[in-house]
């Protein structure tokens, strides 16, 4: 017998997943692990530490702040190492300090100052002129920027690639359309995926064009403390330069808080992106139900606890559920965050701590869709059998050609012929033969079938990028 020994740490990690309140840190922890370095309490503290140190270094580089000597190489290296080597144990130290301060940002300030106990000159300028929100708004801005660049964009690109592959592979595969749930003019399987891809690309491009703003201007946004201490300094320029050094856009005219308008735009963008995915998930679910799409069998998976035959569309259902959760949170963020009483209230603090939760649900959804799409197979036999028995969809083609050649009441005549009736090829052929139109037009209609009446679907699919 082979005994598999697990370390205490491994056991603790397993227990943490089992006892987590949120499924993001429990059942789905393996799918959201990459988010924890950004949006966890550790991640937030790490960004706060970085911002405090970078602000201190900028002040030291300003020759007009004569009470703070320019840092030598050793001091700068020591400060940089605090950022570069910051780990969970450091975050735990900050949390221990917070037990005394009962203030999370002040705890960060004290954590840094303890690294320089013998340098009162340095400690006096840690958090200089700042309100907590100066640090926090920049931290959340950097977090959302990092999430966009290192997590959301790569996932979106992967999803777009899979959708594009299906679009191009099946651009010429005719499929019956349905409007209002009823048969409609044919399309192609690929064109329907191209529709989704086009929407996603537009929204993703807009996401990447959103400017991410930050502010550092003091307790009510007027540089009161900065200006009274050093009136000779150009604090507007110093603040702008600092924020730009973090690869953010400066917002100089604010109250105590950066107003979060860009954040609302970011959230609204992800709502729109997720809504397109929700639309696609439901359509794929429907096509699976119709038998148009099949799911590749995974040998050891179980579809139902009682019905052995089932292969359920669980990936698309999982995506749908998580997209709904993400959007409900993003909607609240977008409505709540731009509102703050007078110059500031604290209601945004607890709300912003959940930004990673909303993104996490979206990440789970995209990963579920990638898994589901990779198991999809198109059943062209079922699709073809369905479309070839729906001759009534050619009513549109016939009445439109009749219009061209001036035949009276074309729509009304086709409505009488087709609406509510079982239409066959022979019925349509007899009707076309009776029409007074040029032979070439008549032959074109006689040779037309439901599967060839796809317009420019294939050409349009090729436009998808």
Predicted regions and their residues:
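Short amphipathic alpha-helical segments with heptad-repeat character
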Residues: 145-153, 157, 194-197, 201, ...
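Generic, well-ordered alpha-helical scaffold segments in large soluble proteins
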Residues: 55-59, 111, 115, 147, ...
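N-terminal amphipathic/basic-hydrophobic helices that include classical n-h-c signal peptides
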Residues: 1-12
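Acidic, glycine-rich loop-and-beta core segments that form the ion-binding/anion-interacting portion
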Residues: 235-316, 320
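Glycine-rich cofactor/substrate-binding loops
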Residues: 14-46, 97-102, 291-292, 304-465
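Conserved helix-loop functional segments at active or binding sites
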Residues: 169-173, 206-209, 213, 244, ...
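A helix-coil-helix interface module used to build multimeric assemblies
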Residues: 14-223, 230-239, 303-304, 316, ...
